[in-house]
Amino acid sequence: MFGFLKQVGDYTRDAVDAARNLAQGFAVTFDHMQRRPVTVQYPYEKLIPSERYRGRIHYEFDKCIACEVCVRVCPINLPVVDWVMNKATKKKELRNYSIDFGVCIFCGNCVEYCPTNCLSMTEEYELAAFDRHSLNYDNVALGRLPTSVTTDPSVQPLRELVYLPAGEMDPHTVSADRPRAGKLPAEVLETLAPVKDEGQSSKAVLKEDA
């Protein structure tokens, strides 16, 4: 008698727990059903990268002086600089320059320390290939002009959540030309003015609001 009642109690407890777990799962599902869609239909829709996005490295062959600073500051000594010494001019002659993006960690050290600014970071991130050797870009591939999400006619640009205008939560309903929430880095710099104090180096202070 008591064993039967214990089984009924255990069954009832398990049924209540199952119903509670099911209700919690449906609560999460219904909560998401009320939200607006945020899924990006890639590759027809792409998010606009941030201003400081570190994508594929762009290289300008004419500016390079083969100083190999990029090789020394690279954590993995990745860039390959092939040069020969011109005995007539006693200067280096650059023959080839390559970077393997299959190994690159996109830290940006080479771009930051380049004395001639021949390297720059772009917003390209589509570097997938069937052969890993295809990721080894020479100076010709590195010199290709970068593409932009906002200028590609076959792509609908979408802003990330942090770059949406104030009050907007859905990137699908916001056009690319609407002002974002907050100021761009260039706009922030415009609000700074150099001021020299006696005995101190010049520093930037915020302009007084008009």
Curated annotation (Swiss-Prot):
Disulfide bonds: none annotated. Signal peptide: none annotated. Residues 55-84, 95-124 form the 4Fe-4S ferredoxin-type domain. Its cofactor is [4Fe-4S] cluster. It holds the Pfam family Fer4_7. Keywords: 4Fe-4S, Iron, Iron-sulfur, Membrane, Metal-binding, NAD, NADP, Plastoquinone, Quinone, Repeat, Thylakoid, Translocase. GO terms for biological process: photosynthesis, light reaction. Its EC number is 7.1.1.-. It catalyses: a plastoquinone + NADH + (n+1) H(+)(in) = a plastoquinol + NAD(+) + n H(+)(out); a plastoquinone + NADPH + (n+1) H(+)(in) = a plastoquinol + NADP(+) + n H(+)(out). One of its GO terms (cellular component) is plasma membrane-derived thylakoid membrane. It is a peripheral membrane protein. SUPFAM superfamilies: 4Fe-4S ferredoxins. Gene3D superfamilies: 3.30.70.3270. It comes from the Bacteria. [4Fe-4S] cluster 1 binds at residues 64, 67, 70, 114. [4Fe-4S] cluster 2 binds at residues 74, 104, 107, 110. It is an enzyme of class 7 (translocase). It is found in: Cellular thylakoid membrane. NCBIfam families: ndhI, NuoI, PRK05888.1-3. Belongs to the complex I 23 kDa subunit family. NDH-1 is composed of at least 11 different subunits. NDH-1 shuttles electrons from an unknown electron donor, via FMN and iron-sulfur (Fe-S) centers, to quinones in the respiratory and/or the photosynthetic chain. The immediate electron acceptor for the enzyme in this species is believed to be plastoquinone. Couples the redox reaction to proton translocation, and thus conserves the redox energy in a proton gradient. HAMAP family: NDH1_NuoI (MF_01351). This is NAD(P)H-quinone oxidoreductase subunit I.
